[in-house]
């Protein structure tokens, strides 16, 4: 396990003018934290891809189940992190991350089988570029907002359908990137998460 060296090599390649990327298990991003932090300080366009992002794949036990890693990476200044919910959001994540030339990015992926969200029924994945978007909405003002990232978005969609059948007005917000969501105007952020709707449920493995 040489994640620290892998991250350091990517930083060197980026300094030489190349566009490097590397991948590993999310749990072992702990070993890569110093080179990731350096790439942020140096504004290097390194792309770090981490898989096995939750307890959803548990064959290897708790040593391989990430809990606090998402919070640590999100707290690193200058790093853009995206956690897509399905194949459509993965494609949009690449479209968003590749043009970034002056900051490192982290793409966090699941390993277990996940459904591909039907975009004929739900909103297109292009909203990922703004960090968060309304995936499904209620008729009228929602009673509750269900927020999720990554593999948990599918769970929230199921909850939305059940609540809808029970007459509860719910909105589903896919929020693959917290820091990207800070960039759009406040008017957009308020349209996704209206301040007047305080009943909110966030679903994530950590």
Describe every region a protein language model picked out.
Residues 1-70, 89-92, 99-206:
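Thiamine diphosphate
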Residues 17-19, 45-47, 80, 104, ...:
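Proline-centered loop/turn at the N-terminus of a beta-strand
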Residues 15-21, 76-78, 139-144, 169:
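Short, surface-exposed connector motifs at secondary-structure boundaries
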Residues 21-23, 48-50, 81-85, 107-109, ...:
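General beta-strand structural signal in soluble alpha/beta enzymes
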Residues 27, 85-89, 151, 176:
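Short beta->alpha linker loops
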Residues 84-100:
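Conserved glycine-bearing catalytic or ligand-binding loops at nucleotide- and phosphate-handling centers
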């Amino acid at each position: 396990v040489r994640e620290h060296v892998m991250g350091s090599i990517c930083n060197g390649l980026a300094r030489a003018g190349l566009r490097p990327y590397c991948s590993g298990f999310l749990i072992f991003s702990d070993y890569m934290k110093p080179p990731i932090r350096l790439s942020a300080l140096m504004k290097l366009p390194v792309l770090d891809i981490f898989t096995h992002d939750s307890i959803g794949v548990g064959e290897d036990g708790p040593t391989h189940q990430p809990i606090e890693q998402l919070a640590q990476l999100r707290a690193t200044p200058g790093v853009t992190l995206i956690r897509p919910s399905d194949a459509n959001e993965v494609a949009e994540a690449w479209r968003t991350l590749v043009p970034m030339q002056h900051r490192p990015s982290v793409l966090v992926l699941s390993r277990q089988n996940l459904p591909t969200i039907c975009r004929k029924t739900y909103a297109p994945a292009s909203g990922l570029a703004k960090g968060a978007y309304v995936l499904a909405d209620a008729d009228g003002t929602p009673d509750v907002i269900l927020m999720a990232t990554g593999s948990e978005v599918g769970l929230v969609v199921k909850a939305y359908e059940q609540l809808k059948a029970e007459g509860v007005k719910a909105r589903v917000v896919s929020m693959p990137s917290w820091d990207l969501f800070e960039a759009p105007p406040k008017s957009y952020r308020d349209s996704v998460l209206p301040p007047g709707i305080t009943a909110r449920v966030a679903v994530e493995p950590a």
